Amino acid sequence: SCLVTDGGGAVVLTSAERARDLRRRPVEVLGYGERTTNTSMTAVPDLTVTGAAGSGADAFARAGVTPADIDVVQVYDSFTITVALTLEGLGFCGRGEALDWIAGGRIRPGGDFPLNTSGGGLSYCHPGQFGILLLVEAVRQLRGECGDRQVPDARLAVAHGTGGILSTHATVVLGVDA
C-alpha cells in the first residue's frame, strides 16, 4: 500500500426527510457551481485567472452566502500556486493578493482562516482520492467530528476541486442548522 495514492472515500446523498432519521447530523448541499475553461495549456489566455471565479460565484449565489460567511474551506492543493489562485478566484482575497493575504500564519492550525484542516493533499494523499476527501473533511467539520483539528462552531463550509490543468472547477457550499 502507498500513502500517496491508496485510499478512498464516499459521500451518501439522501432527501432531507430521510436525513432527519439518521444517527449522524445531516449536512445540506446549499449551493454548487462548475466551470471548464480550457482544454490545453496553450489555450489559456491568462494563467492567473481560473474557473474558480465562475464556479464559486454560482455556488455562493445558489447558497445565498458570500465568502465572508464561510467557516471552513477545503481546496484541492496539487501545488502551492493552485491554492493561491483558488482563494483569489473564490473571492476570499483579491487577485494577486493570496500570498500576502495568507502570510503570518493565517491558514495554519488555529489561524483565522481554517483551510484544508485535514492537512491537505500536499501533506497526505495527493493524487488519487483527495477530491472526495475534501467533501469528507468538510462534512466532518460541520458535524463536529474532527477532534483536535475541529473548527469551533463551523456551520458553513466550502469544498472546491480542480481537474485537468486548472481547467475544470467544481465548488460546493455545505451547511448545517445552528
Regions found by a protein language model. Give the residues of each.
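Generic secondary-structure signature for well-ordered alpha-helical cores
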Residues: 17-20, 34, 61, 65, ...
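Condensing-enzyme catalytic core mediating Claisen C-C bond formation in acyl metabolism
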Residues: 1-58, 104-118, 122, 150-156, ...
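Hydrophobic alpha-helical bundle architecture
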Residues: 66-74, 97, 101, 116-125, ...
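Extended hydrophobic packing segments that form well-structured cores
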Residues: 139-140, 145-146, 151-166, 170-178
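Electropositive phosphate-/nucleotide-binding environments in soluble metabolic enzymes
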Residues: 2, 6, 46-53, 77-81, ...
